[in-house]
């Protein structure tokens, strides 16, 4: 699958030229994952991020959306695709995996932190999805007691919660199941 990316970052245009450019989805993800979560994160956290990022990208690629390389869509830094072997490994080991609900690719959101509470999408935006459930997030709460992180929109995967859970030995598929209720 291919995805069209409007390049706005100087480091990306220096390598790939002016956008939008057409990129192989899996190669694109190799530049997204280390831009969104620390390369030094536990491998299960990197895998969870890879699946969430792939799901987000596939949903938009299927709709013909041209994404950009900022956090308005997903952060993408082309130079990191080659200098982040652990993120690349996570992308390769989860190749093709996307989250679905009722047989459809979900509209997959994630953020740095949810402040200790997973939010319904309807609490933040105009549309409610059944796989975003309002509930306490013990992983995000535990992570934030170790390091202060400002919460963002709080819908979907919390990156600090994901990293904390992975360090405790939680597999990536269980991390994803917690943040995307009922999605497979």
Place the predicted regions along the sequence by residue.
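Conserved, single-site charged/polar hotspot
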Residues: 1-184
């Amino acid at each position: 699958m291919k995805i069209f990316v409007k390049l706005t970052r100087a480091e990306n245009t220096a390598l790939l030229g002016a956008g939008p450019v057409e990129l192989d989805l899996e190669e694109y993800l190799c530049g997204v994952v280390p831009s969104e979560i620390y390369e030094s994160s536990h491998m299960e956290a990197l895998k969870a991020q890879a699946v969430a990022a792939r799901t987000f990208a596939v949903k938009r690629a299927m709709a013909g959306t041209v994404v950009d390389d900022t956090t308005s869509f997903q952060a993408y830094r082309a130079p990191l695709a080659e200098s982040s072997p652990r993120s690349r490994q996570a992308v390769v080991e989860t190749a093709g995996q996307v989250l679905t609900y009722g047989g459809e690719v979900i509209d997959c959101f994630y953020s740095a932190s949810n402040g200790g509470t997973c939010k319904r999408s309807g609490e933040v935006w105009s549309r409610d999805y059944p796989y975003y459930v309002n509930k306490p997030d013990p992983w995000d709460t535990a992570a934030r007691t170790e390091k202060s992180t400002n919460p963002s929109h709080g819908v979907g995967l919390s990156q600090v919660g994901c990293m904390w859970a992975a360090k405790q030995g939680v597999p990536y598929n269980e991390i994803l199941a917690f943040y995307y209720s009922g999605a497979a």
